């Protein structure tokens, strides 16, 4: 039976999800705060509202009467989801999961205090004065993040007391939602960051994708690769942690569970209840299902017989370097001239410095050197130039 799916947030991850569910025959309303967002370009209907406005959110839900609501971003009045669930609407993964994971304080306290997971030492601060005290307790270097933000917005590293003023002002400029509060995390001396894509199903066991390695700058991913080399014991531990936290949050869908790998072991970092930006590497055909296809199947209650690695792959971000509109792209011929490569241009209508506008993809046979594949993706990303008016 055809489902009516409302997507809240219509960026590049949402675009690929829409394509996946449209291929399965479903109807999609794509919602965002601006018109012509990437997912709106491939959806059946579109709405443009401020999703932090509860009345506006209620109005479009009442107008369209969706069967399923799929959040893609943090800046949503997520407490409304509990009411929608009571009305019989499926919220993905669940209203509880969406509310907990849209706020770093809720998910960190759940992970550390309730579930006893190992995390970086952390404190919270709701003012510049509290931030100074929190940093004094945590020590430097440390990372300051808004409780609600994505793609590294508002995130900075404090190395000395002189950085505190900037850290506070930057966190406030990059936050989403109403809360001014930030989380202060002690720096973990990790050697690898991984994402463990975890799939919870309505009528099946929890499944795991092969681990994805990634590198970040300014809190935003720059490259990702799959598989990431990790010991069997650490992988098993990561899977146990991912299953524990997703079971607590409840619901069906894909989750991006992030970990730090350090010399002294594994640290839980963050969790997203939706396809993960680092998981765009699966668009390179690394698995038998992309993360978006897995999300679609899990959300719709369709079977996922198994997840298997098909080949080695990598993704690298194509970013803008200035503010503008009507972006154009050059260098595609050169980038696509390399064998075993591909590219995705997201279709965002405007640019700004560091804004992610596309990704290059590279792949090779199973067992190939992942560093070589990653280098190819990075080299191709540098060939693509973004211009705008």
UniProtKB/Swiss-Prot annotation:
One of its GO terms (molecular function) is phosphoribosylglycinamide formyltransferase 2 activity. N(1)-(5-phospho-beta-D-ribosyl)glycinamide binds at residues 12-13, 72, 277, 348, 355-356. Its EC number is 6.3.1.21. Pfam families: ATP-grasp, PurT_C, RS_preATP-grasp-like. Residues 109-300 form the ATP-grasp domain. It is an enzyme of class 6 (ligase). One of its GO terms (biological process) is 'de novo' IMP biosynthetic process. Pathway: Purine metabolism; IMP biosynthesis via de novo pathway; N(2)-formyl-N(1)-(5-phospho-D-ribosyl)glycinamide from N(1)-(5-phospho-D-ribosyl)glycinamide (formate route): step 1/1. Homodimer. Involved in the de novo purine biosynthesis. Catalyzes the transfer of formate to 5-phospho-ribosyl-glycinamide (GAR), producing 5-phospho-ribosyl-N-formylglycinamide (FGAR). Formate is provided by PurU via hydrolysis of 10-formyl-tetrahydrofolate. HAMAP family: PurT (MF_01643). Belongs to the PurK/PurT family. This is Formate-dependent phosphoribosylglycinamide formyltransferase. It comes from Chlorobium phaeobacteroides (strain DSM 266 / SMG 266 / 2430).
């Amino acid at each position: 039976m055809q489902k009516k799916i409302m997507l809240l947030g219509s960026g590049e991850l949402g675009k690929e999800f829409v394509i996946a569910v449209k291929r399965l025959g479903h109807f999609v309303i794509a919602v965002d705060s601006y018109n012509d967002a990437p997912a709106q370009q491939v959806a059946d209907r579109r709405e443009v509202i401020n999703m932090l406005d509860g009345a506006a959110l209620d109005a479009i839900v009442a107008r369209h009467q969706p069967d399923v609501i799929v959040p893609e971003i943090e800046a949503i009045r997520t407490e409304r989801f509990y009411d929608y669930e009571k009305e019989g609407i499926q919220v993905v993964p669940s209203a509880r999961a969406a509310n907990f994971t849209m706020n770093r304080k809720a998910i960190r306290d759940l992970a550390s205090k309730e579930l006893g997971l190992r995390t970086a030492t952390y404190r919270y601060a709701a003012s510049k004065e509290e931030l100074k005290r929190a940093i004094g307790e945590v020590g430097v270097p440390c990372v300051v993040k808004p409780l609600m933000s994505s793609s590294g917005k508002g995130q900075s590293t404090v190395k000395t007391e002189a950085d505190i003023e900037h850290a506070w002002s930057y966190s406030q400029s990059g936050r989403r939602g109403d809360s001014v509060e930030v989380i202060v995390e002690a720096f973990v001396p990790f050697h690898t960051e991984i994402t463990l894509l975890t799939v919870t199903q309505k009528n099946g066991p929890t499944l795991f994708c092969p681990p994805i390695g990634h590198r970040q700058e300014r809190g935003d991913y720059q490259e990702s690769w799959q598989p990431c080399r990790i010991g069997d014991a650490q992988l098993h531990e990561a899977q146990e942690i991912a299953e524990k936290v997703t079971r607590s949050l409840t619901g069906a869908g894909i989750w991006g569970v992030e970990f730090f790998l350090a010399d002294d072991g594994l640290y839980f970092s963050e969790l997203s209840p939706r396809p993960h930006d680092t998981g765009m590497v699966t668009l390179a055909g690394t698995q038998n299902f992309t993360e978006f296809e897995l999300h679609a199947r899990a959300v719709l209650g369709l079977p996922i017989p198994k997840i298997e690695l098909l080949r080695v792959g990598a993704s690298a971000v194509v970013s803008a370097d200035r503010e503008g509109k009507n972006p154009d792209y050059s260098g595609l011929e050169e980038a696509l001239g390399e064998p075993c490569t591909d590219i995705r241009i997201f279709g965002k209508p405007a640019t700004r410095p560091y804004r992610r506008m596309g990704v290059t993809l590279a792949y090779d046979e199973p067992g190939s050197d992942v560093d070589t594949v990653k280098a190819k993706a990075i080299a191709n990303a540098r060939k693509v130039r973004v211009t705008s008016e």
